[in-house]
UniProtKB/Swiss-Prot annotation:
The gene is dapF. This is Diaminopimelate epimerase. Its EC number is 5.1.1.7. Pathway: Amino-acid biosynthesis; L-lysine biosynthesis via DAP pathway; DL-2,6-diaminopimelate from LL-2,6-diaminopimelate: step 1/1. Keywords: Amino-acid biosynthesis, Cytoplasm, Isomerase, Lysine biosynthesis.
Amino acid sequence: MSNTVEFARMNGLGNKILVVDMRGRKDVVTAAAAIALNADPATEFDQIMAIHDPKAEGTDAWIDILNSDGTKAQACGNGTRCVVQALAAETGKKVFTFQTVAGILNAVEHEDGTISVDMGRPVFDWDKIPLAEEFADTRRIELQIGPIDNPVLHSPSVMSMGNPHAIFWVDKDPMSYDLARFGPLLENHPMFPERANITLAQVLSPTLLRTRTWERGAGLTLACGSAACSAAVSAARTGRTGRKVTIDVASAPASGQLTIEWRENDDHVVMTGPAEWEWSGVVDPVTGSFTRAQEQGAQAR
């Protein structure tokens, strides 16, 4: 078996994704390889999407997801769109079904190049998110950062979109908050035994939200698809918006928007947005050493 596999550097709204082709192999991308790849500026990433042979009948692939710190992730909406684009370019297919540790994901590439991913149903039960304390209503829980009488952030909505999320509603631009300071404290708060993704969300109109996310296991990120889904669901649950909104991802590149619909007929959350290929190469999934394909020569690391 060759020591190297093909991989591509891609992004979903700037969310840095490495798509690694592990089909036909029995091994996995190791935590050591993930940490090594993230340490190199050329391959620094938010998530690795490792494509494996399907485990279940009727699925196109098993997707193993790793964070930049080497830990496993249960879901990555932006990364899933990147996988769809890569496989659509390879196979000519437009409709895909993937299996992850969080369950089944269905996705479709549209004629305009955007990609929709059915992220499944949100989970609101406190013990399934999970939380360390019991809350009958997870639309708003008791948690704050800052002085008791004047907290900077407080009373988040919490849920799981395959991974734990806390949504803090704010009245000003999410970029104006020091999320690099508060993010690690909240991600690792005792309330979240499996840690959590932390999102600041602002209502700009009844159909438009603005968000910024500290991603569990990755830190500040340009975009997070499951966080955008969680913000949209929280907005609808708390009466701030209807069930279909546009998400303006504050930290994403220009025109960084996602459309999120929390369908009423089945409670599934469908995310639609772009994916972009940047470059490709080969990588050792055990060590993380890679060679980047270039028009003139190649660069080995």
